[in-house]
């Protein structure tokens, strides 16, 4: 049985037509579409159990709290984490990186310590570090990306040192589809420093089976809306012993143990990092998204992504005038950023929309690397579980027609 053959039927959005044409959605790198089960799970809370979590002794609150905390355990199993207390809920991956950058810098780093990033990172994994580097007198170093859009591991070995305290890299590039060898990078870090290893899982977690114990990393960050869940929910996983060392960076209700007029003490991990009313309905939607993916199995999701990528590489290989930013590594994601000589990416995207094809145009929050390439913007096609070979064929034909019309 092919689990993906009729999968669009699970997603109400695909009942829409765009400009009298079937929707061809190739922008899952920005956000995924949502299956009916996720929408229904969230509606069920509002219709039947809605109440604030952790704070009520009545039935509705107890039911909602059980659903909400149950998602923490689902995330633990989904990542093969050591303990559900290692799962920190945030409002997204960006907030997750801001939390880590501020909490780690505040508690564990000293002036002159170094942070290593790659030059192909998303802004969410650059700007928070820039902000804390300025505040705490830290130094950021960048690892180059080679002509194949892969991380230069020789340069990593040269730049990492005992002064390196944080290495934070993408698990899957939202620009080129690069899937770095995380375990190899982990071994390089261990040989040369005691740095914390953080992985940006925003693109990785929706497409690959992630086992944090096997990878040997210290933290991973991802958002719910890219893996079939709603906006407004994200996850930081971190090793419990490290989380216990960190201080909260946001204060308020639900993260405290005792409050006095002149001081306060914190609740245990994970709650000390989750101030205020949490996005409990969004978390429950994330849990339904995880259930949906695990019903398929992440192994099959990964294989589908690989099959799409290989087909795309084949049909895109002869595109006239089109330059493609995509790694040629054996393992990569189904993410293709492109530009056409003498035609702006936004014009291409607007023209593709007339054919019902949805792609992203811009710098995809990887502006420094676009600048290095001398490109103002690209348009990007990203595939997911509800895409098939026909979607890629429609995209290619629409792209060729768009180029012909735009000159």
Describe every region a protein language model picked out.
Residues 1-407:
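Pyridoxal 5′-phosphate
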């Amino acid at each position: 049985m092919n689990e993906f053959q009729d999968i669009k039927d699970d997603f109400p959005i695909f009942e829409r037509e765009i400009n009298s044409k079937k929707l061809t959605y190739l922008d899952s790198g920005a956000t995924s579409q949502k299956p009916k089960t996720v929408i229904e799970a969230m509606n069920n809370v509002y219709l039947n159990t809605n109440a604030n979590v952790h704070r009520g002794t009545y039935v509705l609150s107890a039911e909602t709290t059980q659903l909400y905390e149950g998602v923490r355990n689902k995330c633990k199993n989904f990542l093969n984490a050591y303990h559900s207390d290692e799962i920190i809920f945030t409002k997204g991956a960006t907030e997750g990186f801001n939390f880590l950058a501020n909490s780690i810098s505040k508690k564990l780093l000293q002036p002159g310590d170094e942070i290593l990033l790659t030059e192909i990172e998303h802004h969410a994994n650059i700007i928070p570090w820039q902000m804390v580097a300025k505040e705490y007198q830290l130094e950021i170093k960048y690892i180059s990306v080679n002509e194949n859009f892969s991380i230069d591991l020789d340069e990593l070995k040269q730049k990492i040192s005992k002064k390196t305290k944080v290495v934070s890299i993408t698990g899957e590039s939202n620009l080129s589809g690069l899937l770095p060898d995380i375990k190899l990078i982990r071994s390089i870090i261990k040989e040369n420093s005691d740095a914390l290893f953080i992985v940006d899982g925003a693109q990785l977690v929706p497409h690959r089976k992630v086992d944090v114990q096997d990878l040997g990393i210290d933290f991973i960050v991802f958002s719910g809306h890219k893996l079939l869940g709603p906006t407004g929910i994200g996850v930081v996983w971190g090793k419990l012993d490290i989380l216990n060392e960190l201080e909260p960076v946001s204060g308020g209700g639900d993260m405290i143990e005792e409050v006095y007029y002149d001081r306060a003490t914190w609740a245990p991990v994970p709650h000390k990092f989750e101030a205020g009313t949490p996005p409990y309905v969004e978390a429950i939607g994330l849990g339904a998204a995880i259930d949906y993916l695990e019903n398929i199995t992440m192994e099959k999701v990964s294989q589908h992504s690989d099959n799409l990528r290989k087909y795309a590489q084949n049909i895109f290989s002869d595109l006239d005038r089109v330059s493609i930013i995509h790694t040629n590594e054996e393992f990569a994601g189904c993410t293709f950023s492109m530009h056409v000589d003498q035609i702006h990416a936004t014009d291409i995207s607007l023209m593709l929309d007339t054919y019902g094809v949805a792609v992203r145009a811009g710098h995809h929050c990887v502006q420094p690397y676009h600048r290095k390439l001398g490109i103002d913007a690209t348009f990007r096609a990203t595939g997911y579980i509800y895409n098939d070979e026909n979607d890629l064929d429609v995209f290619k034909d629409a792209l060729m027609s768009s180029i012909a019309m735009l000159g």
